[in-house]
């Protein structure tokens, strides 16, 4: 590899990783702001029902769907931090070669998990406020995690893209 190509590769890696970090930070801020705003807005009772989704304040001591609510908070926090560290390491390594939607997906997963960890570290619970009536109440960071995971799965299922031009074959003899 030439020195010029190597510099281009390093720049591409830097840009991809910067995109990951910036999008993650922005989504964390949005998720935290939504949780902070939900508490005073919904403390007096349920908010508007928009049909498919409504607003109801729930403080979740557990993890997904309230599971693990009886586990010690410190244990949930340590396991969550370990998972975030693993995903962040995977993202840092793979993002330079990943398509944009996988980068966005990894940022969503990291942001959602980090936001919920920050929220839990404040008072031992996660603030949930989105309610469907047929699904446990959840929050915007949960949406980031779900959509992000779906984007990552799409990237895994996507056929690999070759960097070489397609091979042309001669027409068959008739």
Segments the model singles out, each with a brief description of its role:
Residues 1-174:
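Alpha-helical transmembrane bundles and membrane-interface segments of multipass inner-membrane proteins
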